Swiss-Prot record:
<feature type="transmembrane region" description="Helical">
    <location>
        <begin position="500"/>
        <end position="520"/>
    </location>
</feature>
<feature type="binding site">
    <location>
        <position position="216"/>
    </location>
    <ligand>
        <name>Mg(2+) 2</name>
    </ligand>
</feature>
<feature type="site" description="Important for ion transport">
    <location>
        <position position="223"/>
    </location>
</feature>
<dbReference type="GO" id="GO:0000287">
    <property type="term" value="F:magnesium ion binding"/>
</dbReference>
<feature type="binding site">
    <location>
        <position position="617"/>
    </location>
    <ligand>
        <name>Ca(2+)</name>
    </ligand>
</feature>
<feature type="site" description="Important for ion transport">
    <location>
        <position position="178"/>
    </location>
</feature>
<feature type="binding site">
    <location>
        <position position="193"/>
    </location>
    <ligand>
        <name>Mg(2+) 1</name>
    </ligand>
</feature>
<feature type="transmembrane region" description="Helical">
    <location>
        <begin position="384"/>
        <end position="404"/>
    </location>
</feature>
<keyword id="KW-0813">Transport</keyword>
<feature type="transmembrane region" description="Helical">
    <location>
        <begin position="568"/>
        <end position="588"/>
    </location>
</feature>
<keyword id="KW-0997">Cell inner membrane</keyword>
<feature type="site" description="Important for ion transport">
    <location>
        <position position="662"/>
    </location>
</feature>
<feature type="site" description="Determinant of potassium independence">
    <location>
        <position position="457"/>
    </location>
</feature>
<keyword id="KW-1133">Transmembrane helix</keyword>
<keyword id="KW-0406">Ion transport</keyword>
<feature type="binding site">
    <location>
        <position position="189"/>
    </location>
    <ligand>
        <name>Mg(2+) 1</name>
    </ligand>
</feature>
<feature type="transmembrane region" description="Helical">
    <location>
        <begin position="287"/>
        <end position="307"/>
    </location>
</feature>
């Protein structure tokens, strides 16, 4: 009976999140969208974003159909159906979220005419839609498919293997969306900056720049649709991995270990919806403070709600209900720590960013050296925090305790994605205000909103990486337990004296570097093509710089769309193909080594790239705020170079490593019956 009510609670909360998202979308779209010029610019951004996503999803669907058939033939059709559900829901969360985002941008710009409170309301509500859809659709997919399989009378083991298929489907969408969106957005950004700011000397978001619309489109497909797919996948994967681990250790964890993570996710949705209502800013008030207030309220309410649920469901757990409650609290505390650490390394008010800005005064080279130093140093505190969380959670609840800490951390995804999706909305709002030549007081509202948006985007990347590392660790635990269950007569230990384990470790360690290199080179090629196109238009359409002729915005958008789709395919298949080859050729121990190697180097490479890139970006903004000579100074030119390097670091290669480390683990989990 308790099981039935718990499942209904999870499904009810998932539906509540989707209803909240739909009502908020209706409210946002009902807001005024400004004058004809603003609407024209917004329509161009909407058209570009839609064209890109349609082509991206068409390409993914071709790969998806092939994988659907392979999974069905070699594993089971229930797993294949799960794969399809995960892929469709992940794509849907990103698609709807992005469609709202490209409508909220112009409405935020219009609301900025009436002050910061109104503009903040529109921008945050626009972001909250994506956040609630991610957790709502994620929980609905996992709990709904689980409920259907249970109703069909399938054994628990078969149910959970089918859910691993759902995790694989969401992961596939995630890596394509993260990588393709990242190549598009940074190809546009770097190309627009190199010719616009550096060569032509025109400011950011200047309507004379032929790549300016592509740049604004990129903000949405990268930071909104890309992040939505990334955290949808991490959310779904973590819940499924925790359910699977609970089922494999039922004797220790008690009869409700499979249901517990679903209920935690459900009550956290209610906490996030209440927390979102607290995000209000008064004129002269702190924007970041208002956003953090929402996160803190959500976290505190979730912590309160976890207690009765844990006591009701986990009384029969060998570690005790209060020990598991402590594990859930560790997950929430880790969320706060990761957010604070990332802000420290990427916020303009702190030492690391100011150090990079100061280094810019002595030239381009010293800016790069300082940025690389910060990017490497920034790995220390987050990794120590993750290690402390793993130690604490294991102490209280064993491997299942680590899984619960990861689930609690991911249960805040609704609120965290809202912070992230707020970023491209305010960024676009500033761009629209600039291109539509709105009065300076509008930019005085959109600029501080955008500055905070840059920090929230960096913070959510840190959160996504930390949670991905924990999720991958839980998946690895599932892999080892599944191996043991499938081969009860053999003892599986990943011994460093075993040469196949060492080979696996080394191959796993190189994959994030190889993948990151492919992503960086792809952005370089895409940006180079944009630079050539922008130069051609400046040369062949002489009236652009004087404002008498209009640039061909659609050329850059179309070129980047084709380039991003082409470039994303090979790197995205890397984490699917490599574990299959290693597992089938070298065996399960080498595959285990591969998983650990990828988790370790993936965590460091991802943190280093995203935080370092964020520090370069905000060092440029710090100088633009009037420090070290301000805009147009030699320090500013050096900072633009650093930002140009940092852009693909933080928005393409770094974030795409998150889904990479999880896909490798999921593929390994699916391979267990074949090993």
């Amino acid at each position: 009976m308790l099981e039935h009510y718990g499942l209904m609670l999870a499904l009810g909360c998932a539906v509540l999140a989707i209803v909240y998202g739909m009502l908020s979308a209706r409210w946002v779209v009902a807001q005024p969208s400004g004058n004809a010029r603003m609407q024209e610019i917004a329509a161009a951004i909407q058209e570009g974003a839609r064209a890109y996503l349609n082509r991206q999803y068409l390409t993914i669907s071709i790969a998806g159909v092939v994988l659907f058939v392979l999974v069905g033939l070699f594993l089971s059709w229930y797993t294949a159906i799960g794969f399809a559900i995960g892929a469709v829901l992940s794509g849907l969360a990103g698609y709807i979220g992005m469609n709202v985002s490209v409508r909220a941008n112009v409405r935020t710009a219009q609301a900025a005419r009436h002050g910061i409170s109104k503009a903040m309301d529109v921008a945050f509500r626009g972001g909250a839609i994506t956040g609630m859809l991610v957790v709502g659709l994620g929980l609905l997919g996992v709990a709904g498919y689980f409920a259907i399989l249970q109703a069909m009378g399938l054994p628990l083991e078969q149910n959970l293997h089918a859910l691993v298929g759902l995790a694989f489907g969401s992961s596939l969408i995630s890596i394509f969306a993260r990588l393709g969106g990242g190549i598009f957005t940074k190809g546009a950004d770097v190309g627009a900056d190199l010719v616009g700011k550096v060569e032509a000397g025109i400011p950011e978001d200047d309507p004379r720049n032929p790549a300016v619309i592509a740049d604004n489109v990129g903000d949405n497909v990268g930071d909104c649709a890309g992040m939505a797919a990334d955290l949808f996948e991490t959310y779904a994967v973590t819940v499924i991995a925790t359910m699977l681990l609970g089922s494999l250790t039922l004797a220790e964890t008690g009869p409700h270990a499979v249901l517990y993570p679903l209920v935690l996710g459900g009550v956290s949705i209610v906490a996030s919806i209440i927390g979102a209502a607290f995000v209000k800013v008064k004129p002269g008030g702190s924007i970041m403070g208002a956003l953090y207030k929402g996160v803190i309220v959500s976290g505190v309410l979730a912590a309160i709600a976890y207690l009765p649920i844990t006591q009701a469901l986990m009384r029969e757990n060998a570690h005790g209900a209060m020990s598991l409650y402590a594990c859930a609290l560790i997950g929430l505390v880790l969320t706060g720590l990761i957010v604070w650490i990332t802000e420290y390394y990427t916020g303009t008010q702190y030492g690391p960013v100011q150090h990079v800005a100061a280094a810019s005064t002595t030239g381009h080279g010293t800016n790069i050296i300082a940025g690389l130093g910060i990017s490497m140093k920034s790995t220390a505190l987050p990794v120590i925090a993750v290690c402390a969380a793993i130690w604490g959670a294991f102490h209280f609840g064993g491997l299942y305790g680590i899984a619960i800490a990861a689930t609690a951390m991911l249960s805040m995804a609704g609120m965290i994605v809202a912070l992230d999706a707020y970023g491209p909305i305010t960024d676009n709002a500033g761009g629209i205000a600039e291109m539509a030549e709105l009065p300076p007081e509008v930019r005085n509202v959109t600029d501080p909103l955008d500055a905070v948006g840059n920090t929230t985007k960096a913070v959510t990347k840190g959160y996504a990486i930390g949670s991905a590392a924990l999720a991958a660790l839980v998946l690895f635990a599932d892999y080892t337990h599944n191996l043991q269950a499938a081969n009860p007569n053999e003892v599986f230990a990943f011994d460093l004296s075993d040469h196949t384990v060492i080979i696996g470790l080394l191959i796993g360690g190189l994959i994030p570097y190889l993948f990151g290199a492919m992503a960086m080179e792809a952005v370089g090629r895409a940006a180079g093509a944009v630079v050539e196109e922008v130069r051609r238009q400046f040369r062949d359409i002489p009236g652009i710089m004087t404002g008498t002729a209009k640039p061909q915005y659609d050329r850059a958008v179309d070129m980047l769309t084709r380039s991003a789709i082409r470039e994303m395919i090979v790197p995205s298949l890397l984490p699917v193909v490599v574990p299959v080859i290693v597992g089938l050729l070298l065996g399960p121990r080498a595959l285990g080594g591969l998983l650990i190697g990828t988790i370790v180097t993936g965590l460091f490479v991802a943190i280093s790239m995203t935080t370092g890139g964020g520090a370069w970006d905000n060092a440029k903004k710090y100088i633009e705020d009037g420090h070290f000579g301000g805009k147009g100074s030699e320090a500013h030119k050096a900072a633009i170079t650093g930002d140009t390097v940092g852009d693909p670091y933080k928005d393409t290669a770094g974030p795409a490593i998150n889904p990479l480390i999880k896909i490798i683990n999921i593929v390994a989990l699916l391979l267990v019956p074949l090993l």
